Amino acid sequence: MNRRTFAKGVALLGAAGPAALARGAAEKPEGTLGEYYEEPARKLPVRKFDVVVAGAGTAGVVAAIAAARQGAKTILIERKGYPGGTVTEGGTALHSFFNLWKAFPGVEKRQVVKGIPQDIVERLTKAGGTSGHAEMFAGYNYDSVCTAIDTEIYKLVVFEMLAEAGVTVAVNTLLAGAIVDGQRVRGAIAESRSGREALYAHALVDCTAFGDLAAFAGAKYTEPNDYPVVNSMGVAGVSVERYYEFLQSHGAVSQLAKGWRSGKEGQIVRLDTNGKAFPQEFKDEARKIGLAMVITTVHDDYFMFIKMGLKMPVSPTSRDAVAAAELELRRRQAKAIELLNKHVPGCEKAFIARTSPTLNIRRARVIACDYDITSPDVLEARHFEDDVMAYGFHDSAPRLQVKGGGTYGIPYKALRVAGLENLLAAGMLITSNHDAHMSTRNTVCCMGQGQAAGTAAALCAARKCGTRDLPYRDLRDALVKAGVVLCES
């Protein structure tokens, strides 16, 4: 059975998921016990929207707000009980609203991502939930600005912004399938404790990180499994200043940014190390558990993000492999606290105050789109005739940097899912090339992609046109009006 047949089966039969249909469930008579079970056909209640956004993470939140601000009746589906995604669970900070000007003397400082992402930062600032755009004083060949956040305040702020925009926010709701008619995606199947339902829309946006909606719809994809998975934790009972003094005394500070922390300006909000200060026992054990000591914080006595990582043998779409990784990562977190207590000044009384509810990925499925952004596109600072945002950060810096501290463009065609109409994608599920993806997957880039995709979806719904029929000029005008920066170089 091919993906197209599978997708139609999900839509028409209301099947619970891929396994039941993909393995030929129809071969068994209804009610027969055996290797497979065929779910009986059932009618699902229908709700109609202009735009469906799947996944309320980094890209999805912004996509839904953007669509609703354009006047589209929008629903946002999220399996957890809150919006936020990787921003609140696995990131170290928001990277990056600015070009890498500090690494290139004479290059102008420019904020290249604005629009809804900047609206979020301004709301966080009012709520005391961000460092602000904190300038880097060390390690600025990696990033010129660090924007640290409070994970819990972020969840509240974006939840409120979604409500204010008029988005129907369906948290605690699973995406269970796609409704497909030929090459056109007509809607999504959602399931919650309120029941199973069909959500019809004129345009849909997949922001699930895993590419679940696109996969259900029959899109082509690959699963490169080229990154480790992580679980991040927040660590309390620490002294940021004592830890900094320890690193500084050994010449071990590799990154340093200062901004707002606990209501005071000019405080350390980001701190990384080259590892020189740590005893060999700590280094050896930290390496075994994949411990990364990149610290960001907006509170005294708290490290907002410390990560444990591991490389899975298979893609993080594997349920059983993920279960094993979830357990192992939590064991590693406990070991990390032991190491901090024993070896690191300022961390003698450290304890786990927060963990991610599930492991964090950098990608799982890579969804084929009309255009696949390449590494030369990123590194050579290329722009396109259909740019929907500009971006200038690369997570492999200083080894890889956008040329001359400039920016490259994300084209609209890179957000259109190949072979399907009415379906867009945004976030870490686009871009197959690893080096290019090391830029496009980052949080602020995902946010910008979300604004573009949500805006495009709303315009398609208003004009009753397909995602490939939308005039670029209309999309460009709407994005610029909403504060998006385009055509920077």
Task: Kindly give the residue locations of the regions a language model identified.
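Conserved N-terminal/central alpha/beta ligand/cofactor-binding core
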Residues: 30, 66, 72-73, 79-177, ...
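Flavin (FAD/FMN)-binding glycine-rich loop and adjacent Rossmann-like elements that form
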Residues: 41-42, 86-88, 128, 155, ...
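Beta1/beta-strand and adjacent pyrophosphate-binding region of the FAD-binding site
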Residues: 46-57
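N-terminal Rossmann-fold NAD(P) dinucleotide-binding loop
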Residues: 60
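A structured beta-alpha segment of the ubiquitous adenosine-cofactor-binding alpha/beta core
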Residues: 162, 172-175, 189-198
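N-terminal export signals
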Residues: 5-26
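A short, basic/flexible loop-to-alpha-helix module at the beginning of a structural domain
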Residues: 33-48
